[in-house]
From Swiss-Prot:
Belongs to the adenylate kinase family. Residues 133-144 have a biased composition (Basic and acidic residues). Residues 122-159 are annotated as: LID. Consists of three domains, a large central CORE domain and two small peripheral domains, NMPbind and LID, which undergo movements during catalysis. The LID domain closes over the site of phosphoryl transfer upon ATP binding. Assembling and dissambling the active center during each catalytic cycle provides an effective means to prevent ATP hydrolysis. Pathway: Purine metabolism; AMP biosynthesis via salvage pathway; AMP from ADP: step 1/1. It comes from Idiomarina loihiensis (strain ATCC BAA-735 / DSM 15497 / L2-TR). This is Adenylate kinase.
Length: 215
């Protein structure tokens, strides 16, 4: 069961990735984790990646694809894997196919921008413990204060409305074209593409995913 998760930041992919890993016993493959462990291990690819990153450049698709190939050849990926945050662009998706990396399911989490902005800009965090609140959906007992310590809650830079909107526009520009790309492959019978309504309650989304993938 080889799965790609698509969806804007804040669409709920992380929560559902956790559910899929626990339910189906497949690992989540994060390109960030792979880069860090390759650099730590001092492998050839790791050295190449480190040089590029030290120069403040973006790591090339070629290096990332090689890392993905190495990672999915490991024993824990025998029954499948979950890719989140990769591919981000059509050239990356093409490179995956050219390298024989097959995908069974592409799951897109569809949530309107305004709901994402509301979800993320309403988050408040207690820096000491990492406890997360939401001004509407999960408010603290006292506005702006942590329930347990009474200390101030903060808005993470990533959750500020301006930042959220910027990340959404990058997603629409770079990654959204992948939706069409995988829909086309799905029509050709080369993968299964499914759009999930990410505005539903978390449990409902998990239930839908479970039903879909157990078919």
């Amino acid at each position: 069961m080889r799965i790609i998760l698509l969806g804007a930041p804040g669409a709920g992919k992380g929560t559902q990735a956790q559910f899929l890993m626990n339910t189906f016993g497949i690992p989540q493959i994060s390109t960030g984790d792979m880069l860090r462990s390759a650099i730590k291990s001092g492998s050839e690819l790791g050295k190449k990646a480190k040089q590029v990153m030290d120069a403040g450049q973006l790591v090339s698709d070629d290096i990332i694809i090689e890392l993905v190939k190495e990672r999915i050849a490991e024993p824990d990926c025998q029954n499948g894997f979950l890719l989140d945050g990769f591919p981000r662009t059509i050239p990356q998706a093409d490179a995956m196919r050219d390298n024989g990396i097959e995908i069974d399911y592409v799951l897109e989490f569809d949530v309107p921008d305004e709901i994402i902005v509301d979800r993320m800009s309403g988050r408040r965090v207690h820096p000491g413990s990492g406890r997360v609140y939401h001004v509407e959906h999960n408010p603290p007992k006292v506005e702006g204060k942590d329930d347990e310590t009474g200390e101030d809650l903060v808005v993470r830079p990533d959750d500020q409305e301006q930042t959220v909107r910027k990340r959404l526009s990058v997603y629409h520009e770079q990654t959204e074209p992948l939706v069409e790309y995988y829909q086309k492959l799905s029509e050709e019978g080369k993968t299964e593409y499914h759009k999930i309504d990410g505005t539903q309650p978390v449990e409902r989304v998990s239930e839908q995913l479970g039903d879909l993938l157990r078919k």
